[in-house]
């Protein structure tokens, strides 16, 4: 039975009904990755998405003569060589082998002997996501952060010229291809820009895409009236304006000197310009020009609206489509086009070719939505209609009939999830691979070759590895605590390739926008230069297939909330124009609002409206914020700036040795701990068979059907993580919370640890607090803490540091790990084993040898003294030097683990021995597979007993068991598991059993019973999984024997030492609450000196009351008082944000606990024993210890390293550097007239090389200090001036 020791039950103060479950908080990472690989989807059912789409876009590949064609059929991934833990230990990448099935065919009639070849080809090892949504790259966990960037599509903007004229522009941003921009200028002319550089009138572009004449262009906007060019008609038109030029056109013939051909060229001469008013004398000119008609301005249209078109036509020098395309070619290439077709092709390739230009599904959707065009989503290129509609929309903007876009609106920004980023990297890798395949095909003429001969696996894996290792969005995972992990995986960054840069990002893009509501957290963002550029996804938000962030709402129809149906998820664009009620608007069980006035949101406004005007309602009060901000109780009483700090500081809380869940929580603590994937969760109902500190064995309740299709044992073993180091050197150590024989329910937590307590997130401890000054020690946010907190290990944490040493093969010989180190005392090596590695359990301090290593010295002639010493003490000590790893300054701890990885020696006897061992494990592997096969035959026979076959087919179409035949053990064994697979070459496999037929069969509709077919599918899937696991294990064992541990080139051995440091709370450590109330421990006071309650209970912590009013984080006071009541009553509370306990409810809890309801208590001074004059706010507050520990920062230097050039001491603790005495500090000493101290600091303590050596000598001899010399920095200055040919001498 589940006991209360495995669960915290909380009293909730929530008033709103929240029937909607939280989504999986890691869904954005896990689902994106699964959708990219489509692992669980059979090849024939895969969507043209993710990896499958990349292959489809790059294949088929053919040579330049189309003789050979390489087609893509399918891809699959094998099991990884090492599991996640092994990769972390060995510093390897957790990756899976990617294999593609390719078909090579030949169309060359001269090469009829060539057989079509299908082959599975290895494309490289691809980093694979762990269950926790991270990647292990070179032994370190990393996260791919999602990127927020501008959505593809069309954007309309407005700017102002310096003279005050409004300028309008439209920019089309594609996924792939050239940008095109349309913009107006101060002269009211519209230009088109291609790739932000080449500019020409927009009418030139319109002519180039098929609207060649002035009449065609004017007709697009309904501006022209065509009149037949007769004398009578022209006479009637006298006094009206021409809308198009009157041209005289003729054809000229000339002989091409190169070819001798006669070539015709059309010529134009402008007789009358646009906007000319027709006069009497123009009649004959028009008639004689040979023009069939003239184009006049329409009199029924307001010409002023279209002035820009007329102005642009005036600027346009071209008169036909041919002239326009040639003019654009000249602009783009800075040279004349060789012929008209080349000029046309360049326009086509820029915007109308799907090979060069791609708007993507999103871009097409955005353009259709904006311009109201009805293009199908399959049209991924720009169309003529798009260009015309954009020009029309711009004219509408100029005439104030349309609105510009808000670039910060979330409909114009989309998320590039990890899957999409991988897609673009694979596209680059496969495009490179396609080029090399093409080159190799062209080289191989009529000779036999296979697909594997064309492919270089390194091409793809180098691109992918460089992305995971160096890309700005592939980040070292923040693993301080489970919340830090979850937040990092849910992060949205506007930085990175193709995004913003923090230098260029202005205030608007960083600011909160009304569309962020329910999508991006309005609170959680960094405080530094990245403020507003890095955000976090809200708790209920999700990213849709197009990359837009959606948030859920309940529909409200005629003032009644739809409580029966599931909420609808809406993007920012879909939500525009709707009145949305807040989640705390009360309604009854039928959905009728209780109040007749409802507070609502309408885009960026907040009206109070009648219920029947409401369209939607929020589903939860914490919908507006992220996971971290949702964990702050009484957030509604805190200033946003402090809440931001509270959110960020929870991520820095170090996991404690004895964590404790908060008394006052928000109800989300359990969900965060579960979704972090840190804890072990029961997969089904069952019983605990065995439990100890290292493992838990569970026997789950399985049905006979489940047992039949499973190959696993009934008992499942879970290993608990013990003292594992995280990326931030904190410690994961899990311990069981269930007991032997206990019955558990599905979803129940089996262990705790790593900042969790009974399945809930526990980042800190509940402490008895008093808000009062104490002897001035809590001035300026400093904290006074009781000795009891230190003594009882309340804030003690364990930190694990990893030290590694590589043994290399150098030019002078191989380095060696040993405990026999020259010139070192026996005392120093007493804890080293024979490999020179310190023993587990040894206590170490700074300067101790952790790993003993010797390196060969350079060969040089020894002096006579050395020869003598060698003769006496042996040859060993002379030719090697000590290269051991020593404990760095300030390190004190206990060795908890050591590891040694080695590459085996290439010895003949060892090779023979390992060959025998490989044969042994190969035999065992073959036996295991045969046993599995036998088990599978038994299970299939039992499942299909008495059933009639509906036809068991091979995927090539052959029938293996004919339709109508009854299944039996005999025909299953003979036909499904024959001794030889006729479709596969068994020489390609390790053992014959690997090539069995089952994997090639269509596992579909073997019988007429649907249920049995489903079970056959499950059974075959489980069998193939088990077979792959067995194969993976064999490959790993064989690899270990043949190759040894995988180590980088040139490294023979790798030794690792893990040291655990127990960090008790100290003066100087940083602590914080959840409301942005941070401070540094200033004094640890004895229990008896701390202020105490009237019953004698001393408080644990004293905070300064002045830290509350100016910071406006009153939430901490509410938390303090409710925490006090909870402690007295033995209750834990859930007070969800914006829906938590009211002032009255807090008072009621205090009353129930028999505590003063004013929230203040009489306190007694521990030092004097006298009561304080005024009552003090005393309660229980949740405090965390942050990662900024004084032990990591404390540093002192006596003698240390100097910079080579300036000869000044280095800076920083890592370099064992000094404290910089800067310009302002020098002023301070000058102001005091402390000349000698100043001289000493600027010379012998800094860069007076000779002076500091002499000073040391004088101190040793007890003499007076010498006069300082000239500092080295003066010499550096002199040398630099000499570089400018200026000679300076110092006297």
Swiss-Prot record:
This is DNA-directed RNA polymerase subunit beta. Belongs to the RNA polymerase beta chain family. GO terms for molecular function: DNA binding; DNA-directed RNA polymerase activity; ribonucleoside binding. The RNAP catalytic core consists of 2 alpha, 1 beta, 1 beta' and 1 omega subunit. When a sigma factor is associated with the core the holoenzyme is formed, which can initiate transcription. The keyword Repeat does not apply. It comes from Cytophaga hutchinsonii (strain ATCC 33406 / DSM 1761 / CIP 103989 / NBRC 15051 / NCIMB 9469 / D465). One of its GO terms (cellular component) is DNA-directed RNA polymerase complex. It catalyses: RNA(n) + a ribonucleoside 5'-triphosphate = RNA(n+1) + diphosphate. The lineage of its organism: Bacteria, Pseudomonadati, Bacteroidota, Cytophagia, Cytophagales. HAMAP family: RNApol_bact_RpoB. InterPro entries: DNA-dir_RNA_pol_bsu_ext_1_sf, DNA-dir_RNA_pol_bsu_external_1, DNA-dir_RNA_pol_su2, DNA-dir_RNAP_su2_dom, DNA-dir_RNAP_su2_hyb_sf, RNA_pol_bsu_bac, RNA_pol_bsu_CS, RNA_pol_bsu_protrusion. Gene3D superfamilies: 2.40.50.100, 2.40.50.150, 3.90.1100.10, DNA-directed RNA polymerase, beta subunit, external 1 domain, DNA-directed RNA polymerase, subunit 2, domain 6, RNA polymerase alpha subunit dimerisation domain, RNA polymerase Rpb2, domain 2. The keyword Glycoprotein does not apply. CDD domains: RNA_pol_B_RPB2. Pfam families: RNA_pol_Rpb2_1, RNA_pol_Rpb2_2, RNA_pol_Rpb2_3, RNA_pol_Rpb2_45, RNA_pol_Rpb2_6, RNA_pol_Rpb2_7. Keywords: DNA-directed RNA polymerase, Nucleotidyltransferase, Transcription, Transferase. One of its GO terms (biological process) is DNA-templated transcription. DNA-dependent RNA polymerase catalyzes the transcription of DNA into RNA using the four ribonucleoside triphosphates as substrates.
